[in-house]
């Protein structure tokens, strides 16, 4: 193993230790606002949520959320940016999020990614999508071909433009 890889691994492990791991929203009576108040009382740390998270029409921002273990549904919400979110283990629904301007730090989506009917103009830091990718009715669908999109990120499924 190269020294650079060892250093990256050590730094990644240190970051993991600073990550508050929340098993699921059910521990907060499935109430996003209760979770946010708890996080505020803890100094708004970086955090991850295990399992699925349904926040449709519910949020404008995700705060310091870094990872979601399962499916994340933000479809039709007022979300503007995914902020610090880096990894979604399952699929990610952002369909019809009219205020969405940025994918923030998002790098990995384990399942499909629906960006249909959004104003997203760039895939930002996105490196991988495990399922299909819907870019229909977006500025990206007019700007790039399927082949160009495939050259930008790695993924398994179909691209819908």
Please give the residue ranges for each predicted region.
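N-terminal capping/linker segments that flank leucine-rich repeat
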Residues: 1-61, 144-161
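Concave beta-strand-loop units of leucine-rich repeat
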Residues: 49-61, 66-79, 84-100, 105-121, ...
């Amino acid at each position: 193993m190269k020294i650079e890889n060892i250093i990256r691994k050590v730094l990644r492990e240190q970051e993991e230790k600073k990550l508050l791991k929340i098993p699921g929203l059910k521990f907060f009576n499935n109430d996003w606002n209760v979770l946010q108040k708890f996080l505020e009382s803890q100094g708004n740390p970086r955090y991850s949520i295990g399992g699925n998270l349904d926040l449709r029409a519910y949020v404008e921002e995700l705060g310091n959320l870094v990872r979601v273990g399962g499916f994340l549904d933000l479809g039709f919400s007022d979300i503007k940016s995914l902020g610090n979110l880096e990894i979604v283990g399952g699929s990610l629904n952002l369909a019809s999020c009219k205020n969405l301007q940025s994918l923030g730090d998002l790098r990995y989506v384990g399942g499909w990614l629906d960006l249909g009917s959004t104003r997203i103009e760039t895939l930002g830091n996105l490196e991988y999508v495990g399922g299909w990718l819907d870019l229909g009715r977006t500025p990206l669908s007019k700007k790039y071909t399927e082949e160009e999109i495939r050259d930008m990120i790695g993924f398994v499924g179909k691209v819908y433009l």
